[in-house]
């Protein structure tokens, strides 16, 4: 009987310890000066705030976090996250499954880059504005398992095709275990292509353009069976 009470007391103490773990403790665990910086944490791990979050020296702002306990019966550890700052609005669910998969659900994002606040800014050089929704994105370590989402963005013309900016519709999916984003400017064919995100944030972009093809044909006097395309690659961390 004494052993039983000892075990129950220990489990009760452990539950209280876990339940009362402060958000500032989580902030200390997540804080990595090389990539992630967090000024402070308030509340508890299951409901609280991370203040002054920076990722790769870019200010993200304050993040509100709340745990959804009943999702454990669905095999998930699910958290609702939200950010509301000048230049960025984000709200949705992040978490882990009992199998170890990372997931995002019902995430809505609005970006208005280059909005200055207290001498800091969200600096995404080629994006004028962006609005997107990720219905779901499931990742298994380095593999994309399933994804669905869409959005619209106004981007600066990176290819010298037009003097100002282009409005693009884009669509999220998985292909060959990679995250794939198809984008198009619509029926005008001004710009279309896809972005592949691979291991370790490596990406590849391939884009085609009716206007680019016309210019090349004029200069080369060649008739192409397939539209010429522009390809380049890099690391996503270089974009932030």
Residue ranges and their predicted role:
Residues 60-72, 132, 142-179, 217-239:
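Beta-propeller and related beta-repeat scaffolds in trafficking/envelope systems
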Residues 51-53, 80-82, 133-135, 152-154, ...:
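Residue-level recognition of well-ordered beta-strand positions that form the cores
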């Amino acid at each position: 009987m004494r052993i039983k009470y000892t075990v129950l007391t220990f489990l009760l103490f452990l539950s209280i310890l876990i339940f009362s773990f402060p958000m500032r403790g989580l902030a200390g665990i997540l804080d990595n000066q090389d990539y992630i910086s967090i000024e402070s944490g308030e509340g508890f791990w299951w409901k609280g705030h991370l203040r002054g979050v920076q990722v790769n020296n870019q200010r993200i702002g304050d993040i509100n976090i709340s745990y959804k306990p009943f999702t454990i019966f669905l095999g998930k550890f699910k958290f609702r996250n939200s950010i509301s700052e000048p230049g960025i609005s984000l709200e949705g669910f992040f978490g882990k499954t009992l199998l170890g998969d990372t997931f995002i659900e019902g995430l809505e994002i609005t970006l208005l880059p280059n909005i200055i606040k207290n001498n800091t800014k969200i600096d995404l050089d080629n994006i004028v504005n962006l609005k997107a929704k990720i219905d779901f994105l499931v990742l298994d370590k380095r593999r994309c398992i399933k994804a669905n989402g869409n959005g619209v963005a106004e981007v600066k013309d990176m290819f010298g095709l037009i003097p100002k900016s282009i409005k693009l519709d884009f669509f999220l999916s998985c292909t060959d275990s990679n995250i794939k984003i198809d984008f198009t400017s619509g029926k005008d064919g001004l710009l279309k292509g896809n972005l592949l995100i691979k291991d370790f944030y490596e990406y590849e972009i391939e884009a085609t353009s009716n206007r680019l093809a016309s210019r090349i044909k004029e200069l080369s006097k060649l008739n192409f069976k397939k539209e010429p395309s522009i390809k380049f690659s890099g690391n996503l961390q270089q974009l932030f």
